[in-house]
Curated annotation (Swiss-Prot):
Gene that produces this protein: dpcd
Designated name of the protein: Protein DPCD
Transmembrane parts of this sequence: none
Organism of origin: Xenopus tropicalis (Western clawed frog)
Family to which this protein belongs: Belongs to the DPCD family.
Superkingdom of the source species: Eukaryota
C-alpha cells in the first residue's frame, strides 16, 4: 500500500475519538474489517500505543496485536503471570516512538555497547540486531514503512546502550513526518468525547 493510499485508508476509516486519563484514544474500523486503536498524549500528541486486531474466519475477534507501546500486564494469579515472573530477566522488546523517530527498547541486555551491531536488510525489509557474543539476535520490520512502501535507509539507523537497555532509533523519513502531520490535522477535526460521556461520534 503506497503512502497516498495508506493516508486515504486512514481518512476513509470509521473513527471514534475519546479523551481519557490524559490520552486521546482513537479507534479505526477499516473497510476490510480490520481494527486499529491508537493512544496519543493529549498535550504533546506523541503516539503512545498502536494495536491491531481482526476477525477470524468464524467471525470472532482475535487478540489485539501490539505494534507500539508496552504489552498489557497479565492478570495476577494466572499461569502466564507466574511464567513471566520466572523469566523476568529475559530481554524484553518494545517500541516507543518520538515525534521524529521510531524507537525500540530492549531491556535486560547487560553487555557493553561494543558488543552490538544494528543493520538494515533491504532485501527482507527488516532491521537486525546482533551481538558478537551470540547472546542476542533479533529481526524486526518497521510496519509504517511497509504500509507506505518506503525503502529502509541504513543511515537513518542508530543505537545507544545504558542501564542494561539497548535503544535503537530510526529517524522518520520526511514522507512519514508529512503523513503524521496530515493525520493529526484529520484527528483534530474529529469530535472528541470526554471520559464519562455516553456517546462517541464515529466518522
Amino acid at each position: 500500500m503506497a503512502l497516498p493510499s495508506w493516508l486515504e485508508s486512514l481518512k476513509a476509516a470509521q473513527k471514534t475519538c475519546i479523551l481519557q486519563d490524559g490520552r486521546r484514544k482513537v479507534h479505526y474500523l477499516f473497510s476490510d474489517g480490520k481494527e486499529m486503536a491508537e493512544e496519543y498524549d493529549a498535550k504533546s500528541h506523541e503516539l503512545l500505543v498502536r494495536k491491531w486486531r481482526q476477525k477470524s474466519a468464524l467471525g470472532a475477534y482475535g487478540q489485539w496485536q501490539i505494534e507500539v507501546g508496552d504489552p498489557p500486564l497479565p492478570v495476577a494469579g494466572t499461569i502466564q503471570s507466574d511464567f513471566l515472573k520466572e523469566s523476568s530477566s529475559n530481554p524484553t522488546f518494545t517500541r516507543k516512538d518520538t515525534k521524529s523517530s521510531f524507537q525500540w527498547r530492549i531491556r535486560n541486555l547487560p553487555y557493553a555497547k561494543e558488543v552490538y551491531s544494528v543493520t538494515v536488510d533491504k532485501k527482507d525489509r527488516c532491521c537486525i540486531i546482533r551481538t558478537t557474543n551470540k547472546k542476542y539476535y533479533k529481526k524486526f520490520s518497521i510496519p509504517d514503512l511497509d504500509r507506505c512502501q518506503l525503502d529502509l535507509n541504513e543511515n537513518a539507523l542508530s543505537f545507544a546502550h545504558a542501564n542494561n537497555t539497548l535503544i535503537v532509533t530510526y529517524q522518520k523519513p520526511k514522507e512519514i513526518l508529512s503523513l503524521e502531520e496530515e493525520l493529526q490535522r484529520e484527528l483534530k477535526s474529529l469530535k472528541t468525547t470526554n471520559e464519562g460521556d455516553v456517546e462517541c461520534k464515529t466518522q
